Amino acid sequence: MTRLIIGLGNPGDRYFETKHNVGFMLLDKIAKRENVTFNHDKIFQADIATTFIDGEKIYLVKPTTFMNESGKAVHALMTYYGLDATDILVAYDDLDMAVGKIRFRQKGSAGGHNGIKSIVKHIGTQEFDRIKIGIGRPKGKMSVVNHVLSGFDIEDRIEIDLALDKLDKAVNVYLEEDDFDTVMRKFNG
């Protein structure tokens, strides 16, 4: 079986460690553990690394289309490999969750997240698995855009690193388990 694990973010050094890029950060952690490297694919408009986890071929995908067009890369890869929405897992930031909180979710609306909106638009369904990673709301009068495109302060970075460590393990459990409810019970928090 072939699966896509997609991390959402924005390409380039300017966005490397920003809150909006926690999906990319998770994939970087998985790639490091799996000892694989990302290569840019111009056709699919994504950085892609390939590995095998629990006997499944896994493509780690970081769309390079910028967040608002992430669905283009996801749709192109799904079409090429003959995959459907049940074959993808998408990791992304969530403003409405406290920093470092994680939640596996099977389906649902985009909740205002432009990357998820783009995926739903391009693949034609909301029925795909997700990992939401809490980045918290802006403090003070900071705009949402400035918040998601800013880095983490020291305390928040510690929480994010702990969440990414937990998710690194959780993704393996997700790939091994046949029961999504079990994964949600073990790791949502």
From Swiss-Prot:
The gene is pth. It catalyses: an N-acyl-L-alpha-aminoacyl-tRNA + H2O = an N-acyl-L-amino acid + a tRNA + H(+). It comes from the Bacteria. This is Peptidyl-tRNA hydrolase. The keyword Acetylation does not apply. Its EC number is 3.1.1.29. The record marks 10 as: Discriminates between blocked and unblocked aminoacyl-tRNA. The active site is at residue 20. NCBIfam families: pth. Pfam families: Pept_tRNA_hydro (PF01195). One of its GO terms (biological process) is rescue of stalled ribosome. The record marks 93 as: Stabilizes the basic form of H active site to accept a proton. Monomer. Hydrolyzes ribosome-free peptidyl-tRNAs (with 1 or more amino acids incorporated), which drop off the ribosome during protein synthesis, or as a result of ribosome stalling. HAMAP family: Pept_tRNA_hydro_bact. GO terms for cellular component: cytoplasm. Its main location: cytoplasm. Belongs to the PTH family. One of its GO terms (molecular function) is peptidyl-tRNA hydrolase activity. Keywords: Cytoplasm, Hydrolase, RNA-binding, tRNA-binding.
